[in-house]
C-alpha cells in the first residue's frame, strides 16, 4: 500500500448515534509532518485514538504498516504531588529502558538536566520535553504528538517546533501533530489538515510574512512558525454539521463564508 505508515480511508465514528467523524481520508508517510488543526469538539482526539488503534471506526478502514512502532506524546499528564516519581523513574516505566537510554533520550530533547528531579517540580516546557523523550524511547517510525506545545509560551513553542523538525530529519519518522489552534502551526509542516468532524481542507501552511513586528520579535524563531489562512465554501451549524447554502438560508449561529481561498497545493477534503 505505497509508502504510507498509516492510511485512513473514509473513516467515520459515531457515539450514541451522533457522528463525530465522517469520511476522513488521511495518510502519513515516513519523514512527513502532518499537523491536524481544528476547534474543540472537532474530533481530533477521536482521530488520534483511531490512528493509535485504541478506537475502531464504525465506518471505513484504518491501515497500519505491519509491526509499525508508534511513539505517543499525550496532551496532558497529571501526577499526584505526593507520588515520589523522578523523571528517571518515569522514563524507566517504559519496558527495558535503562538509565543510560533515558539520559540519551533527554539529551536528544535538551532536557538532560532534569533527569533526577521530581517530575512534579519541572516546568511546563520541561515536562513537554520529557514526554517527547519518552515517545522517542520506543524508536518510533511514527510520532503522534497531541498538543505538544500546550502550556508553553510562544518563544518556547517555536523552540519545540524546531526540535520536532530536527527529530524528524534525524530519524526519518512520520509525525502526526495535533493542535486546537486554527492560526498557528509549524512552517516545517508538510501538510495541514483542518478538521471539524470531517476534513474541511488540507494543504501546505503559508509562511508568516504579513506582520513585521512578529518577525522582528522572534527573529529566527519566527521562521519556524506559520499561519494557515483559509476560508471554506461551506459553514458549520452549532452542532458542527455542514451547511451548504447562501447566507439567507442559514440557521442562527451559523457563519457563511462566500469565498474559498487556500494556500499553494491545497486540496479540499
From Swiss-Prot:
Major subcellular location class: membrane
Membrane topology annotation: Peripheral membrane protein
GO cellular component assignments: ATP-binding cassette (ABC) transporter complex
Catalytic class of the enzyme: translocase
Domain of life where this protein originates: Bacteria
Enzyme Commission no: 7.2.2.20
A single MF term (Gene Ontology): ATPase-coupled transmembrane transporter activity
Stretches assigned to the ABC transporter domain: 6-221
Annotated compartments: Cell inner membrane
Pfam family name, one: ABC_tran
UniProt family annotation: Belongs to the ABC transporter superfamily. Zinc importer (TC 3.A.1.15.5) family.
Role according to the record: Part of the ABC transporter complex ZnuABC involved in zinc import. Responsible for energy coupling to the transport system.
Protein's UniProt name: Zinc import ATP-binding protein ZnuC
Species annotation: Pseudomonas aeruginosa (strain ATCC 15692 / DSM 22644 / CIP 104116 / JCM 14847 / LMG 12228 / 1C / PRS 101 / PAO1)
